[in-house]
């Protein structure tokens, strides 16, 4: 690799155009071929003359001259002696920059092992030799001898001998009967004598025979390394070095400081160490020193070479004079400060400046204000050129003088230069691509950059002291791209969700909202206006106010573009907004004839963009901004203490709640409820009280009041206006100002039982203030951590998806995903329309009633189609998705669908992976960090009942219902669901019903929307009996498995099951409740099996032994408070957990087959659950379940594939294995979306799908067929498909594999490109693996290309590459033809053929 990278920077060797980079282990011959000479002395430079010492680390003879074209002794100077080697000092006369590329070497007196191959786990040397790492180290570091050739003695091959044992063996067998060696020589001999082909054959044979999993893994690891060596042409003994390369001196400089001291690179220290020890070792060997001394010196040499390559990897870190660890070669590459991330992936640029930003409301959307001083500095070269061209100056020096004096002509020229020359503005942190946009600069006085207010959302900028950087695109192409792609007017929509991002905010919203308010009894109410001019006239003369109800004629155009007018009931304010709307039949006056909240403004801009195009939208946005600002100013909305309204009923609500809480305390004291239940109920009660106070407050604020004297409607409350319009503040904040602050959380996340009753207007008491500081400080600490975590998540996402580019128009697959609306607790949270908008239909979509076609297969679904689909009541639509796209590299345009930032089908070469990563990572800072500890609040309230979300007929699936003694229907099934069908029999909604719920409807009942279907106790999970009889206890031994707990404060006893396995005596117990029938035998259940109900830990018994029970009665209840207080990972950690595909802590166990539950013999603390398969020929599956977990299945229950045997969060790997890719995709998409939805962030599903596609690129071989693979190998899906195509062609058996889900970090490290992986994480490990396998990087992703300094293969770069490739192949063809002399005819024909291949999309 080095030679090729050297060529990149070497002016004398023209940089060859290369298509790929290969990395492999350097053989000693290769190292010598790079080298220009051996370094024999540890000296660097002579401290008096400052000239480099000969044969030292900076030797000019080896590395080249210090000054350009001048030898060291000064005999030859200047260009004319170029290439001559001075006979006196031996230095070649050439450029001094060769000191950046010429390498040297050190001949080692004894071989040493390369630490990367030794210590980078798994250790390659030890795996290859089939020894443990510890043993290899003992040999290498001279602790043990190893037998390399046992001869006829009783010693074994590779046996380790200590010094004593070796001596004894020599005495016993004689020195020439066997060979035992020590140190790197021994390992070198062993590696050199390996026959790789034979080893590979043996390993394959053993693999086929062995049955043990462990051995298989071990053999596979070894086989992989052996095959890597065979395929790459590397030799194993190259992992032991006899020659150490020395990097060029200018890459490890020695800089003189003032005061005669030197600053040096750490590498020089490390090299000096190696050279010193090497020279000492040579001398010792010449002097024939005793073996022990030589061995010690060899060990030290090994250690010093280790430190040079990777300091601190083994043994102590070598430190410099100031006790700071020395930076080794590995450290130069690693981490944020390493070569990859510091210098190759991001470089500093020239022609840039930064300054504070201020608002520029008089700018147009595509402009920014650039301070004159800054512009003068940034555009200097252009100004010099102009001055020269216009004849103001004849030399650069003169031009410089003119500019420095700031002559008037300079300013005129600056104006010319700047005109139509866009500049890029960037605000750090650049979280998504809208963080850098292009503007046309306008020169402004002062020193601050002026920014257009509408682009603030995209930059996430405000004017409280933010700074921004300006960059000047220099080349014509760069200017073109800036104008066409990055101009702020071309970025109206948000790439994450396709909503407009150029939306007025804050003051503008407030002004527009104020304009659009409609009040009653205003002066001029009921007037009619014929046109807008008349209206302006009336407003100027105060005949009518902005908020009066009037009738006005609004002029617009019809479908043919002819002017039409229509009379609307509206207000003058709304007419003013309507005046700005572009005239279009699809943008009627109704779009603005409503209260202009931020949401409605966004919808209005969206409508204008979809129907009138970009130019009109930009003009409209600019005008609407002006209008908003001017009316916000005129409205004079202020914020006073009296605007915070405290509801009169607050005192009563608080009093009632306090009484309720007292009652709960009493119930607890009477022993009716447990401590946990009391806490939950109290927290609930206060939560409800806070809501109620807030509702009352909102009602007071919203109330319409009239002035008794004038009869006019009183002006609206200003705080309410700000919050309701979406300008600033939320109902939650209003609640804290005027209602009550409510419950607070401790830093641990638990909720404190005593709420804060005061609000900020009344002021908090000392205790309340103290209680509220907890949560507030936690919030600040979280924010600081969040930024770093969110940034790291974005980095991993970008890294995994960076090579996902739109590479072809259509892959023609017939696979896709099924999209349905997402319903949560009966509410539709994401409609089907929103989910399929901008995606490609996989099948024809027909109206289910009329059967007419709505959308043809393979067409993009747009807004109009969505409206028809939703109206037709279609429940599910199959669409194309990036997940199922079958393009080999990247994705195809049809599967991806619409480019959200443009609203058109996606372009070829769009880097959709990076866009996806940014869209998911950018809102990361808005997500919460905390894991929620659920102390009962809202959760419980949500989940205690089911309501019908539609009208229709009930259908109960898997019906299993009993009537209990009170005559109520009880759900006894584990997997029952209540479905609502509409009048056409189409399923509208389906909801699971929890076991033990009371059900209020039955099959065939008609229900209205909002009717209650079922309810259950949210605090406990019941265990119910299906048979009647008498209760008997089994293995419920006092003090061992059941505890009669007497609550100290109440004196009431209750019986609770305790963990019986904690004592040796209780280990064989199986606590259960048995129901016996009249004859005294154990009653039989309807599905076979006995009525024996096993109890889980913490169950509270509800019956006494001997009592009678009937069907549907509760025997025991398990409190769910244990489940309620468990952490739910939310926010950022949850998103990271899903993308990293980690197994959740208490993960669910999912049934792999359909079948019947059978309980096997229990182990000590695990319970055996078997599923007896429903179909023949399938093996039964066994699961082990920890005994303390609430397990609610009984013997004989029927269970379907994919159902939960044990509740919890499922592990994504299980979903993939059991239910397949589509189920996994929908699970991941929904779970990730849920987290973002809670924060109100909208992200399109396709972004998450692109990332999940990247996580699913590998397959695990289940059947190798006739391929090279081994069962259990992880290989690239594409690679396997290619291999299979070849095998099938040859008539052999193809290989089969199961898809494997990798977390994003793992997927990034396993990309085909080693350059990309190395620059991500674990640099040494990645490079070690790549070198052994002799990997080739074909430079397909974005990152690799940036690192080698090319245009990325996306966007314009991709097109250029493609054109260049076609051009080169044409040239080759023509040359070929010329060589053959076949004339031009056939060449032209071939060219024609090739022209047809160029994709049309370019």
From Swiss-Prot:
The protein's assembly and partners: The RNAP catalytic core consists of 2 alpha, 1 beta, 1 beta' and 1 omega subunit. When a sigma factor is associated with the core the holoenzyme is formed, which can initiate transcription.
Query: Which top EC class applies here?
Result: transferase
GO CC terms: DNA-directed RNA polymerase complex
Know the name of this protein?
DNA-directed RNA polymerase subunit beta'
For this chain, one GO molecular function annotation is:
magnesium ion binding
**Organism this protein belongs to:** Agrobacterium fabrum (strain C58 / ATCC 33970)
EC number annotated for this UniProt entry: 2.7.7.6
Matching Pfam families: RNA_pol_Rpb1_1, RNA_pol_Rpb1_2, RNA_pol_Rpb1_3, RNA_pol_Rpb1_4, RNA_pol_Rpb1_5
Q: Which family does it belong to?
A: Belongs to the RNA polymerase beta' chain family.
Task: Please list the residues that bind Zn(2+) 2.
Answer: 811, 885, 892, 895
Q: Which residues bind Zn(2+) 1?
A: 71, 73, 86, 89
Quick check: keyword Transcription in the entry?
A: yes
Q: Superkingdom of the source?
A: Bacteria
Q: Which reactions are catalysed by this chain? A: RNA(n) + a ribonucleoside 5'-triphosphate = RNA(n+1) + diphosphate
Task: Give the signal peptide range.
Answer: none
The alphabetical list of record keywords is:
DNA-directed RNA polymerase, Magnesium, Metal-binding, Nucleotidyltransferase, Transcription, Transferase, Zinc
Q: Where is the composition biased (Polar residues)?
A: 1385-1395
Its GO biological process annotations read: DNA-templated transcription
SMART domains in the cross-refs: RPOLA_N
Q: What does this protein do?
A: DNA-dependent RNA polymerase catalyzes the transcription of DNA into RNA using the four ribonucleoside triphosphates as substrates.
